[in-house]
């Protein structure tokens, strides 16, 4: 079977590599037991592939065959910090694949169904932002097919094999496309393009079709009910009372009751299983109950003013932000620690450094750059806060990667400054400006925001917010909220002496499963020390 597939396309270079690497495992990749064999041999794919994708050979003869191939995403590399056995299995089990189909229909030549790829660990669906190729265009490995809007950013999706784009299944602007859902068809021969003009993608639920055949049992039940409807009505009347939360009524009965402002709960059904029918509503109205229920509702309706509103559709980033933050507040036991830090010395050091920067033609250093550096060094000093909770253990990270919250017109992004504890202030500033610009242009790639271990959110400088509590960015265990600096009158050295100093409020949100209160306080003490003695950050 393996040789038959390889002979079909000379461009399956990765299959040849797998055969040379481990013939036995590669053969299993072409069988129906593909996934079990992959679980134990992830090292093969880590060594050979710089992307993760699953290609399924559909309907080759009478069986289905599965293999690894590629939709290059230029982003989800298995060598990244996010990659590991668990993440790899998630990609393998996902439906991100391209499908080479040997159709059972003689009208369809061999083709490839390209599915919506999973471009980030949290991605479950995506949108087609823009098609860069048209139907009929020739495609080559490395060429960009389309731009996919993920839960984090807009990512270019590249083609892995040479051929022709025969059919665009999901048009430009299509939204909420599930991972694995077919978005396009490619063929090897240009003459085959026209054969896919009216093509409908194959269903992934095909194997479940035979299981749905027990449907004929439904008509049997209906036939039994109809002749016994009269006696059953008397028996089932009492049973309608307990199910107060759900009232069974015919559509016509519901409409009639609604038009006359009659609550269905006040009507006793005489139909099968206590079902309320039209005659029951008419009998209720005829009994004189109509007036007592209709008049109050008319008075209420007359006093309710009409609301003027507009419905704004959710963007992909908005839906993901809502989902992740709701998950965070529902599952992470937050607690908050606030401290005031004197920033006079930090502002003085910043002025000196900016003088050097201007003289050398460099960019100015911001307060946020100093805050990121101080947070990174404090994490190195108190590594318990640079951790993540799992059900089996607490994972403490050796890298200090700081996510920085950036608000854009499209939504909230959190790009990451990696190894911030090892970088200088000017380097941190350059990276933050570069990532913020990419976020505003909606051009962040997965490697720009994945792998963070701690988050900093600053609403003080840009918006003048004095103090706030931020929501933890899962799976991290803490987030630092930066408020604005303000001048305060503080006691001087003498009994009647007073000085003016600038103070900034910072609040640390902690996951109590990971960080105990004393540990969080220890981290804030270290952070405050770096802010109030900024020269120590340069050591």
Swiss-Prot record:
Cofactor details (free text): Binds 1 lipoyl cofactor covalently.
GO cellular component: chloroplast envelope; cytosol; mitochondrial matrix; mitochondrion; pyruvate dehydrogenase complex
Pfam families assigned: 2-oxoacid_dh, Biotin_lipoyl, E3_binding
Cofactors demanded by this protein: (R)-lipoate
GO biological process: pyruvate decarboxylation to acetyl-CoA
Cellular location(s): Mitochondrion matrix
Span of domain Peripheral subunit-binding (PSBD): 248-285
Membrane-spanning parts: none
InterPro entries (alphabetical): 2-oxoA_DH_lipoyl-BS, 2-oxoacid_DH_actylTfrase, Biotin_lipoyl, CAT-like_dom_sf, E2/Pdx1, E3-bd_dom_sf, LAT1, PSBD
Region listing for Disordered, in residue ranges: 102-122, 196-244
Protein role: The pyruvate dehydrogenase complex catalyzes the overall conversion of pyruvate to acetyl-CoA and CO(2). It contains multiple copies of three enzymatic components: pyruvate dehydrogenase (E1), dihydrolipoamide acetyltransferase (E2) and lipoamide dehydrogenase (E3).
Family, similarity comment: Belongs to the 2-oxoacid dehydrogenase family.
Record-given protein name: Dihydrolipoyllysine-residue acetyltransferase component 2 of pyruvate dehydrogenase complex, mitochondrial
């Amino acid at each position: 079977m393996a040789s038959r597939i390889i002979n079909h396309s000379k461009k399956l270079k990765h299959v040849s590599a797998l055969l040379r690497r481990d013939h036995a495992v590669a053969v299993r990749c072409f069988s129906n037991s593909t996934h079990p064999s992959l679980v134990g041999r992830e090292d093969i794919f880590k060594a050979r592939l710089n992307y993760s994708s699953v290609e399924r050979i559909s309907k080759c003869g009478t069986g289905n065959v599965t293999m690894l191939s590629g939709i290059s995403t230029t982003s989800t590399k298995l060598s990244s910090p996010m990659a590991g056995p668990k993440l790899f299995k998630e990609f393998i089990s996902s439906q991100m694949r391209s499908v080479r189909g040997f159709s059972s229909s003689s009208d369809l030549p061999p083709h490839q169904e390209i599915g919506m790829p999973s471009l980030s660990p949290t991605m479950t669906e995506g949108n087609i932002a823009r098609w860069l190729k048209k139907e009929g265009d020739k495609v080559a490995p490395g060429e960009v097919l389309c731009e996919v809007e993920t839960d984090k950013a807009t990512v270019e999706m590249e083609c892995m094999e040479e051929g022709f784009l025969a059919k665009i299944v999901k048009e430009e602007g299509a939204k909420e496309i599930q991972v694995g859902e077919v978005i396009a068809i490619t063929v090897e021969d240009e003459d085959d393009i026209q054969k896919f003009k009216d093509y409908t993608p194959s269903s992934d639920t095909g194997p479940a079709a035979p299981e749905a055949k027990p449907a004929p049992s439904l008509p049997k039940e209906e036939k039994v009910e109809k002749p016994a409807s009269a006696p059953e009505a008397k028996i089932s009347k009492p049973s309608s009372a307990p199910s107060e939360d759900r009232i069974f009524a015919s559509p016509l009965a519901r409409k009639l009751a609604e038009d006359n402002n009659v609550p269905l709960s006040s009507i006793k059904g005489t139909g099968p299983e206590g079902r309320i029918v039209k005659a029951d509503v008419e009998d209720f109205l005829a009994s004189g109950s109509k007036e007592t229920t209709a008049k109050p509702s008319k008075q209420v309706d007359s006093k309710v003013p009409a609301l003027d509103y507009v419905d704004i559709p959710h963007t992909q980033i908005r839906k993901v932000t809502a989902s992740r933050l709701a998950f965070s507040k529902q599952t992470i036991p937050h607690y908050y620690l606030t401290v005031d830090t004197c920033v006079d010395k930090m502002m003085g050091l910043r002025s000196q450094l900016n003088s050097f920067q201007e003289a050398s033609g460099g960019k100015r250093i911001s307060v946020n750059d100093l805050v990121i550096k101080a947070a990174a060094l404090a994490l190195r000093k108190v590594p318990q806060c640079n951790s993540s909770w799992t059900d089996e253990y607490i994972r403490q990270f050796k890298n200090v990667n700081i996510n920085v919250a950036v608000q854009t017109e499209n939504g909230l992004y959190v790009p990451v400054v990696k190894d911030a504890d090892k970088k200088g202030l000017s380097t941190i500033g350059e990276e933050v400006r570069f990532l913020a610009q990419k976020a505003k242009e909606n051009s962040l790639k997965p490697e720009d925001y994945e792998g963070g271990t701690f988050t900093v959110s600053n609403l003080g400088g840009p918006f003048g917010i004095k103090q706030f509590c931020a929501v933890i960015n899962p799976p991290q265990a803490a987030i630092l909220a930066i408020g604005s600096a303000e001048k305060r009158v503080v006691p001087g050295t003498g009994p009647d002496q007073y000085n003016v100093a600038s103070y900034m409020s910072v609040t640390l949100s902690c996951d109590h499963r990971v960080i105990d209160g004393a540990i969080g306080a220890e981290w804030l003490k270290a952070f405050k020390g770096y802010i109030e003695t900024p020269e120590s950050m340069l050591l």
